[in-house]
From Swiss-Prot:
Superkingdom in the source lineage: Bacteria
GO BP, sorted A to Z: translational termination
Record protein name field: Ribosome-recycling factor
Family: Belongs to the RRF family.
Length: 185
């Protein structure tokens, strides 16, 4: 492994952590109808737990309404149950051909809970990124011995890994800040 490969691997792992954070934040309700809100839901469908987006489409015709249209009408009851049982606090109404979900405005208490959840997810993301940095630094130590890197080269490589880490932590903070503004805004 070369230093470039180590940097690329570190970036790749940190990018994955950022994507997990994005996915977690997308599942938080902000008071606006957003189809991503339901993407993480699993539906009991013919005995298996299936992601909602594999058996239905979710659209937002207006800022306060989500419409879930299943490709299999028999699955609507199961989808309705999954939405009711989720911790999103949503109440779908079954109109026969689709589920209509009115997104109620967030209460102040719920906003505070969501902001706490955003901060928790952001902290988990930062911790994951720092763990990746630690692993990269451990690999760098081994690599420095293998490649007989000088102390200066090793320090430069450590600084580069720290720069990558700072970049991804800043991105995680930006995602969290944006989500907080969405919730409070």
């Amino acid at each position: 492994m070369t230093l470039k490969e180590l940097y690329a691997e570190t970036r790749s792992h940190m990018q994955k952590s950022l994507e997990v954070l994005e996915h977690n934040l997308a599942g938080l309700r902000t008071g606006r109808a957003n189809p991503a809100l339901l993407l993480h839901l699993k539906v009991e469908y013919y005995g298996a737990h299936v992601p909602l987006n594999q058996i239905a489409t979710v659209t937002a015709p207006d800022p306060r309404t989500l419409v879930v249209q299943s490709w299999d009408q028999n699955a609507l009851k199961a989808i309705e149950k999954a939405i009711r049982d989720s911790d999103l606090g949503l109440n779908p109404s079954n109109k026969g051909d689709a589920l209509y979900i009115n997104i109620p405005p967030l209460t102040e208490e719920r906003r505070k809970d969501l902001v706490r959840a955003v901060r928790q997810y952001a902290e988990e993301g930062r911790v994951a990124i720092r763990n990746i940095r630690r692993e990269a630094l451990d690999k760098l130590k081994k690599l420095a011995k293998e490649l007989h890197l000088s102390e200066d080269e090793t320090k430069r490589a450590e600084a580069e890994i720290q720069k990558i880490t700072d970049e991804f932590i800043a991105k995680a903070d930006q995602l969290a800040e944006k989500k907080e503004q969405e919730i409070l805004g």
